Swiss-Prot record:
Function: Catalyzes the hydroxylation of 2-octaprenyl-3-methyl-6-methoxy-1,4-benzoquinol during ubiquinone biosynthesis.
Oxidoreductase in keyword set: yes
Source lineage: Bacteria, Pseudomonadati, Pseudomonadota, Gammaproteobacteria, Enterobacterales
Protein name: 3-demethoxyubiquinol 3-hydroxylase
GO biological process, one term: ubiquinone biosynthetic process
Complexes and interactors: Component of the Ubi complex metabolon, which regroups five ubiquinone biosynthesis proteins (UbiE, UbiF, UbiG, UbiH and UbiI) and two accessory factors (UbiK and the lipid-binding protein UbiJ).
Claim: Cytoplasm is one of the keywords in the record: yes
Gene: ubiF
PROSITE patterns: UBIH (PS01304)
Subcellular location: Cytoplasm
GO function term, MF aspect, one: 3-demethoxyubiquinol 3-hydroxylase activity
Length: 391
């Protein structure tokens, strides 16, 4: 059994954990990242990853600050400048970058592209140690240090352990941190399609009685479709071949989609989780390990990047003032900054989900009236967009 000391151990080196590790290393912390496997290498002429993230303007700024955005753009991403949502054709809400005098709202980025860009930067940084493949099997606290036991017998001792290991976080579970959680009565299917026409720079979402249908433009003539429906219906779609799925898309997506050819699909259930606490002495949770959200507005990874920004700021400031930066009072500052914001965003998505998953005629009328009012709200609409973009 080997015993390796480090300042900070991060379990999970994905989009959020990788960004956090890089940011902390750039501020001089010695960081060890524990990850099951390296991200898949980027292949330039491959079809897109089914998993797509809508990266907001604020998240792009964070990634630029970390020095990885050029690598993302050198692989591939696609800007979007307009976001539109509606149920009735007479009740559209349109958010446009021009309203905020911005060049764009954000970028559509494949998860594997973002992971690869971050991983390359982590491999090159002298303050980062990568443990891959690495699997956490036990976590204990001794003498103000966290001891992480890995499969194979290696023990890593760290002042601070950070769980960035996703919705089913082992760090959270091993720390005994509970969650508020429930399953939505919906599942989600992601479908990579080739479009007959240029997908453009607008992303849109139509609410239907069965669940939303969304369109995310990608590079070249590629796009991603998002189909929300009952778990039984999504299972039915999963069992179809691509020709059958193409026919279902034509029936159930709005005509503005045009002719598309599906080439890959994946599905997952929708669950809401919120950790009862984000921190303990020498321990913190970030991203999906702390909170998951209905993907309706594409805010999941952006909330994770807000966590990253806040935690880096708290730790760097505490160290600069000579404080015990891994102590509970310091880490509690991070929780105070992020927990309420994440709860507000979760609750907003829950309100949308509840409001648009009921088909009583009076409620349908009221919610479409609400969309019409939102479109005409002017300053309020712009403030809502700025909040969603993290500006």
């Amino acid at each position: 059994m080997t015993n390796q000391p480090t300042e900070i151990a991060i379990v999970g080196g994905g989009m959020v954990g990788g960004a956090l590790a890089l940011g902390l290393a750039q501020h001089g912390f010695a960081v060890t990242v524990i990850e099951h496997a390296e991200p898949a290498p980027f292949v330039a002429d491959s079809q897109p990853d089914v998993r797509i993230s809508a990266i907001s303007a604020a998240s792009v700024s964070l990634l630029k600050g970390l020095g990885v955005w050029d690598a993302v753009q050198a692989m591939r991403c696609h800007p979007y400048r307009r976001l539109e949502t509606w149920e009735w054709e007479t009740a559209h809400v349109v958010f446009d970058a021009a309203e905020l005098k911005l060049p764009l709202l954000g970028y559509m980025v494949e998860n594997t592209v973002l992971q690869q860009a971050l991983w390359q930067a982590l491999e090159a940084h002298p303050k980062v140690t990568l443990r891959v493949p690495g699997s956490l099997i036990a976590l204990h606290r001794h003498d103000d240090l966290q001891e992480l036991e890995l499969k194979g017998g290696e023990v890593i001792r760290a002042k601070l352990v950070i769980g960035a290991d996703g919705a089913n976080s082992q760090v959270r579970q091993m720390a005994g941190i509970g969650v508020h959680a429930w399953q939505y009565a919906q599942s989600c299917m992601l479908i990579s399609v080739q479009c007959e026409n240029d997908p453009g720079d607008s992303t849109w979402q139509q609410f239907t009685p069965d669940g939303p249908r969304a369109f995310l433009p990608l590079f070249d003539n590629w796009a991603s479709l998002v189909w929300y429906d009952s778990p039984a219906r999504i299972r039915q779609l999963q069992n179809m071949n691509m020709a059958q799925l193409q026919a279902e898309i034509a029936k159930h997506f709005p005509s503005r989609l045009g002719y598309v050819t599906p080439l890959a699909a994946g599905a997952f259930p929708l669950t809401r989780r919120h950790a009862l606490q984000y921190v303990q002495p020498g321990l913190a949770l970030v991203g999906d390990a702390a909170h998951t959200i209905h993907p309706l507005a594409g805010q999941g990874v952006n909330l994770g990047y807000r966590d990253v920004d806040a935690l880096i700021d708290v730790l760097v400031n505490a160290r600069s003032y000579g404080e015990a930066w891994a102590s509970y009072p310091v880490l509690k500052r991070y929780q105070m900054r992020r927990m309420a914001d994440n709860f507000i965003m979760q609750s907003g998505m829950d309100l949308f989900y509840a409001g648009f998953s009921n088909n009583l005629p009076p409620l349908r009328f009221m919610r479409n009236l609400g969309l019409m009012a939102a479109e005409r709200a002017g300053v309020l609409k712009r403030q809502a967009l700025k909040y969603a973009l993290g500006l």
